[in-house]
Amino acid sequence: MKTPFERLALYDINASIKEGSYVAVIGHTGSGKSTLLQHLNGLLKPTKGQISLGSTVIQAGKKNKDLKKLRKKVGIVFQFPEHQLFEETVLKDISFGPMNFGVKKEDAEQKAREMLQLVGLSEELLDRSPFELSGGQMRRVAIAGVLAMDPEVLVLDEPTAGLDPRGRKEIMDMFYELHQRGNLTTILVTHSMEDAAAYADEMIVMHKGTIQASGSPRDLFLKGEEMAGWGLDLPETIKFQRHLEAALGVRFNEPMLTIEDAAAEIRALFQGEKTL
């Protein structure tokens, strides 16, 4: 039913993500990031166009028999993934996904043991209720449940929400290690410019339901004024770099995307490898 109050959550979306890449989708609140990610495994279906993952295609207006295949290939870790826990024990919770896709119980339980170790938890937790664990442990158990389904694509929707800086770094480092070890395609939806700069190969910038820009963190973070127009800030390290350049009258060749980048550039400057 048409209405003058109709509003499109997404429009003119045309993007291609390389297999094995780590892509950050960034945008201000309400830009359409979370709506986009829910299309990636068929939680939402497109009203126009199509979504393709390898040979799996979901088309608008058609009965799509490949939804189950798509949902196995694309694992989503939502904000506060611990809210997804529901089983009596950690073992049952992690095993549920694989068994739902037809994996035998004993194989699913073996996969659960492997995934629990992969996320840095002890097998001693397998028989415990997930609701007896600490918040950080619950989050890792929920992540293990997603990984147990052997996804080809891992979508992370603000996965560090509610964590302190140390916990956030631990979780993000873990995802990056999993990305490299498992040759996963990883899509990070985030408000954190620091996380996008530190981990992503490519970035997609969303604003008001459409894609405004895409490219490497290096290239996009050089467009400070455009980023501000899309309601986005720069990483703190790049802000620091600009203040330093203004104060010392120098110009660094590369943007300082991380603290490590900043330390290396400053060290080179004061050791005389860069001239004022």
UniProtKB/Swiss-Prot annotation:
Gene3D superfamilies documented for this protein = P-loop containing nucleotide triphosphate hydrolases
Q: What does the UniProt entry say about where the protein is found?
A: Cell membrane
Bilayer-spanning residue ranges? none
Q: Where does ATP bind?
A: G27, H28, T29, G30, S31, G32, K33, S34
Q: How is this protein positioned relative to the membrane?
A: Peripheral membrane protein
The domain of life is Bacteria
The enzyme's E.C. designation? 7.-.-.-
InterPro entries for this protein = AAA+_ATPase (IPR003593), ABC_transporter-like_ATP-bd (IPR003439), ABC_transporter-like_CS (IPR017871), ABC_transpr_CbiO/EcfA_su (IPR015856), ECF_ABC_transporter_ATP-bd (IPR050095), EcfA2 (IPR030946), P-loop_NTPase (IPR027417)
Keywords from the named record: ATP-binding, Cell membrane, Membrane, Nucleotide-binding, Translocase, Transport
Q: What is its main location?
A: membrane
Per the database record, which ranges form the ABC transporter domain? Answer: 1-233
- GO molecular-function annotation terms? ATP binding; ATP hydrolysis activity; ATPase-coupled transmembrane transporter activity
GO annotations of cellular component type: ATP-binding cassette (ABC) transporter complex
Q: Active site at which residues?
A: E158
Question: What start-end ranges are recorded for coiled-coil regions in this protein?
Answer: none
- What is known about what this protein does? ATP-binding (A) component of a common energy-coupling factor (ECF) ABC-transporter complex. Unlike classic ABC transporters this ECF transporter provides the energy necessary to transport a number of different substrates.
Task: Give the similarity note.
Answer: Belongs to the ABC transporter superfamily. Energy-coupling factor EcfA family.
> What subunit structure does UniProt give?
Forms a stable energy-coupling factor (ECF) transporter complex composed of 2 membrane-embedded substrate-binding proteins (S component), 2 ATP-binding proteins (A component) and 2 transmembrane proteins (T component).
Name by which UniProt lists this protein: Energy-coupling factor transporter ATP-binding protein EcfA2
Lineage at the top is: Bacteria, Bacillati, Bacillota, Bacilli, Bacillales
Gene expressing this chain: ecfAB
